[in-house]
């Protein structure tokens, strides 16, 4: 299981390092929307590196201090990844719901994102600062050396974020359907292309939220109901799918974007000149 987590971490690190490099390489991608995508890729990149370091320190350098640092690093990285997903969801919702005041509200969103990042950093430091079960084995959770209260706090935070994202994506779907209906009224009928576009948009949102929930919900639920006496295979079996979310994120939020695809080709094939001008997409684009 540790080898599988290490392999997963390597794949996550490689995928997201490429996204970060592409966004840093192309000036056309240095827009607020892509900054959020870049922050998500950076968090997932750090999570992948954390999985690799965890494997190395488990089998090469065994130390309680190093173990705590690695666990804290992983907690902060994955928490930052989930928070970045929430920030992207809020950004897309605001771009659709309040299009006229969107750019003024973006500043507030950026401030909240930075505050959330500071909070996740604090969550990662808690095990290092003493909130661990190294001295009291009875307080251990299914994720050693985190305590039961620690993982309960993390799981509760995840459930809250998941519910907020679920609510926002439902509202986004309503807005999409409402816009399609308004277009149909203006044109006196709903064309096949509008129907297909609406159906595709709703399906994509369902896939995004479904992937996120399927990846993290089993692990979050097991952290709450699991007992440290249970076989560790249960922990690994629920943790591994959670890491897959960081592997899927760059595919959903980056590689499917046409601007990033063009920048990727320019990064690898700098000799080619693209005549297509770069246009910053609306953050509501999925």
Question: Residues of each region from the PLM?
Answer:
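Helix-boundary and loop/linker segments of multi-pass membrane transporters
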Residues: 25-30, 103-106, 142-148, 192-201, ...
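Helix-to-loop junction signature of class
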Residues: 5, 9, 46-61, 78, ...
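Seventh transmembrane helix
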Residues: 164-165, 211-224, 236-286
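Intracellular effector-coupling site of seven-transmembrane GPCRs
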Residues: 174-219
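Extracellular TM2-ECL1-early TM3 structural module of rhodopsin-like
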Residues: 1-6, 10, 32-89, 93-105
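First transmembrane helix
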Residues: 1-26
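Alpha-helical transmembrane segments of multi-pass membrane proteins
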Residues: 9-11, 38-51, 79, 113-128, ...
């Amino acid at each position: 299981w540790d080898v599988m987590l290490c392999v997963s971490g390597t794949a996550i690190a490689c995928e997201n390092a490429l996204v970060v490099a592409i966004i840093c390489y192309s000036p056309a991608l240095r827009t607020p929307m892509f900054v959020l995508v870049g922050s998500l890729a950076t968090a997932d990149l750090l999570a992948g590196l954390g999985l690799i370091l965890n494997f190395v320190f488990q089998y090469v350098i065994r130390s309680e201090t190093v173990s705590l640092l690695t666990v804290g690093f992983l907690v902060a990285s994955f928490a930052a990844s989930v928070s970045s997903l929430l920030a992207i969801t809020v950004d897309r919702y605001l771009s659709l719901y309040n299009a006229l005041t969107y750019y003024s509200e973006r500043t507030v969103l950026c401030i909240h994102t930075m505050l959330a990042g500071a909070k996740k950093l604090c969550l990662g430091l808690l095990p290092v600062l003493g909130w661990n079960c190294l001295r009291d084995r009875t307080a251990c959770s299914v994720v050693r050396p985190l305590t039961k209260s620690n993982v309960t706090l993390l799981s509760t935070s995840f459930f809250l974020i998941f519910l907020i994202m679920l609510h926002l994506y439902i509202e986004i779907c309503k807005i999409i359907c409402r816009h399609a209906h308004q277009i149909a009224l203006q044109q006196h009928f709903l064309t096949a292309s509008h129907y297909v576009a609406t159906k595709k948009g709703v399906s994509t949102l369902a896939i995004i939220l479904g992937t996120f929930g399927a990846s993290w919900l089993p692990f979050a639920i097991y952290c709450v109901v699991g007992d440290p006496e249970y076989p560790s295979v249960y922990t690994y079996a629920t943790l591994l799918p959670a890491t897959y979310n960081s592997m899927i994120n760059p595919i959903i939020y980056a590689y499917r974007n046409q601007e990033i695809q063009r920048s990727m080709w320019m990064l690898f094939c700098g000799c080619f000149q693209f005549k297509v001008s770069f246009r910053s997409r609306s953050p509501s684009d999925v």
